[in-house]
């Protein structure tokens, strides 16, 4: 049983590591904090693994744990007032010219800064949207109806558009 959990946990970490890191990068300001937050998420997934009941999909379950840990971190330490992103970690293909690379990095940095200014519920929806999740899964994770998810996302997109174009 314990060995099966270890294998299952390893598969989860292998499959979802990048997704978890992206979410952690919104809630943690610097690379060290992101690593710590990632470790907290992994630990919470490991602790909760025996209680996984398969009522929701594994991805939905992992999102819930990840987002709950990240939001608790944000509330506990109050570190996120204005987010910054480490642009060294952004992978940009070598065949683009340098000016496009700089422009893209600046746009991404500005987007993360705008996301950091949102309230927790809006920030959560944006993160789920950026993960390209269907409204049904967003609804399962947040507890909002699918229609409410769509309405809130539309409003948040307008807020982000305004923030990005200031």
Task: Cite the ranges covered by each PLM segment.
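DNA-recognition helix of helix-turn-helix
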Residues: 140-166
């Amino acid at each position: 049983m314990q060995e099966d959990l270890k294998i299952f946990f390893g598969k989860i970490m292998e499959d979802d590591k990048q997704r978890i890191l992206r979410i952690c990068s919104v809630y943690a300001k610097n690379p060290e904090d992101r690593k710590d937050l990632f470790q907290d998420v992994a630990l919470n997934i490991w602790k909760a693994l025996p209680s996984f009941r398969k009522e929701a999909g594994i991805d939905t379950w992992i999102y819930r744990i990840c987002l709950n840990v990240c939001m608790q971190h944000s509330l506990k330490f109050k570190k996120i007032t204005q987010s910054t992103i480490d642009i060294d970690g952004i992978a940009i293909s070598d065949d683009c010219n340098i000016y496009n690379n700089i422009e893209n990095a600046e746009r991404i940095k500005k987007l993360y800064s705008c996301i950091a200014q949102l309230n927790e519920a809006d920030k959560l929806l944006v993160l789920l949207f950026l993960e390209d999740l269907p409204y049904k899964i967003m609804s399962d994770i947040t507890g909002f109806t699918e229609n409410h998810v769509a309405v809130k996302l539309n409003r948040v997109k307008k807020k982000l558009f305004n923030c990005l174009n200031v």
